[in-house]
């Protein structure tokens, strides 16, 4: 993609519709209710910094890799532009589950990533950019208390 095309993809896109806004809020709401709130007493300044940093870096990287490249290269192709990267993104979420399995189970976590990814894929395709789904993805990934504790060796 290169820096300019990546920056353009991350910042461009038509505004989301009301339905899209609702759908893009759901993953973050789920992460807040299932991960952030139940573990809020474990959060200190260092953990919050790791959570926020991980959320921004991971979400941006995943959006560029699994949506941006395919959106740029196959903008009108349903299979290569949307379905193939959705499968890749979903299976991509299986790898960390081998090291730190979700309490929900590996495959439920991967299925959840696929459902969230399908909403983001639709939004990216409709808007022509990653801005809308990136905000949702950052908010969702920044709720990862358990993952941040693991990164700090606090498991």
Kindly give the residue locations of the regions a language model identified.
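Hydrophobic core of alpha-helical transmembrane segments in multi-pass integral membrane proteins
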Residues: 1, 21-37
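Membrane-helix interface linkers and caps
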Residues: 1-21
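Transmembrane helix-loop-helix hairpins at the membrane interface
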Residues: 31, 35, 45-155
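Catalytic phosphate/metal-binding cores of nucleic-acid and nucleotide-processing enzymes, i.e., regions
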Residues: 41
């Amino acid at each position: 993609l290169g820096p300019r095309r990546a920056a353009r993809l991350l910042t461009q896109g038509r505004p989301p519709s009301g339905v899209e806004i609702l759908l893009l809020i759901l993953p973050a709401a789920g992460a807040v209710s299932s991960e952030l709130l139940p573990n809020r007493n474990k959060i200190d300044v260092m953990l919050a910094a790791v959570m926020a940093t991980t959320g921004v870096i991971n979400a941006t990287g995943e959006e560029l890799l699994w949506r941006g490249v395919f959106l740029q290269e196959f903008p009108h192709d349903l299979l290569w532009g949307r379905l193939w990267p959705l499968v890749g993104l979903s299976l991509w979420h299986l790898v960390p589950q081998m090291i730190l399995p979700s309490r929900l189970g590996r495959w439920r976590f991967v299925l959840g990533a696929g459902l969230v990814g399908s909403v983001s894929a639709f939004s990216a395709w409709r808007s022509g950019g990653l801005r809308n789904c990136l905000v949702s993805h950052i908010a969702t990934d920044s709720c990862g208390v358990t993952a941040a504790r693991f990164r700090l060796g606090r498991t």
